[in-house]
Amino acid sequence: MSLFAIFYLFLAYLLGSVSSAILLCRLAGLPDPRESGSHNPGATNVLRIGGRWVALSVLLFDMLKGMLPVWLGYYLGLTHFELGMVALGACLGHIFPIFFKFKGGKGVATAFGAIAPISWGVAGSMLGTWLLIFFVSGYSSLSAVMTALLVPFYVWWFKPEFTFPVALVCCLLIYRHHDNIQRLWRGQEDKVWNKLKNKKD
């Protein structure tokens, strides 16, 4: 990697470290997502604690944290491998944010934003897989894990030169969901709409 690419990767990490869930919940007067719901500072948990529009804002911001540095890096002439490392850097920032004591979210939206610019085919396949599994199962975590397992194959089909760096990002996502995987295996993971229903009750 070039010195510029390393510097740019660091900038992507810093952008990823800006936790929109924490900041927007503060602005909206909602509880700290790290201390409420699933204790995960991400869009799904913000939705659980009662902020529909805030959750949508968090989702969009987190996607942009991954998308913008990768897109700009492409036009700056970074290699495929360097772009993959930039995507990984943005995801690492979201998961281990330097501004919030290295305690961040799962990185799903940021990873989607970082991988989506590769091609419309990859973006559509990712989104379609996540939505299908979510509406069938009701588990956000299962949707994320299964999508992460399949994304490298989508990338290999549409843009094979990005397969290795994207696979690294997906491995990071699966690792970040290890607690969810254990709860799913034990049958202890809650469905998203059950939590929303319980909150209304």
Curated annotation (Swiss-Prot):
EC number of the protein: 2.3.1.275
Pathway annotation: Lipid metabolism; phospholipid metabolism
BP GO annotations: phospholipid biosynthetic process
Keyword terms, alphabetized: Cell inner membrane, Cell membrane, Lipid biosynthesis, Lipid metabolism, Membrane, Phospholipid biosynthesis, Phospholipid metabolism, Transferase, Transmembrane, Transmembrane helix
Subcellular location: Cell inner membrane
The UniProt record lists the keyword Glycosyltransferase: no
Cellular compartments per GO CC: plasma membrane
Function statement: Catalyzes the transfer of an acyl group from acyl-phosphate (acyl-PO(4)) to glycerol-3-phosphate (G3P) to form lysophosphatidic acid (LPA). This enzyme utilizes acyl-phosphate as fatty acyl donor, but not acyl-CoA or acyl-ACP.
NCBIfam families: glycerol-3-phosphate 1-O-acyltransferase PlsY (TIGR00023)
Catalysed reactions, as listed in the record: an acyl phosphate + sn-glycerol 3-phosphate = a 1-acyl-sn-glycero-3-phosphate + phosphate
Family, as annotated: Belongs to the PlsY family.
Protein name: Glycerol-3-phosphate acyltransferase
GO MF term list: acyl-phosphate glycerol-3-phosphate acyltransferase activity
Subunit-level organization: Probably interacts with PlsX.
Top-level class of the enzyme under EC nomenclature: transferase
Primary residence: membrane
Ranges annotated as spanning the membrane: 3-23, 53-73, 80-100, 115-135, 153-175
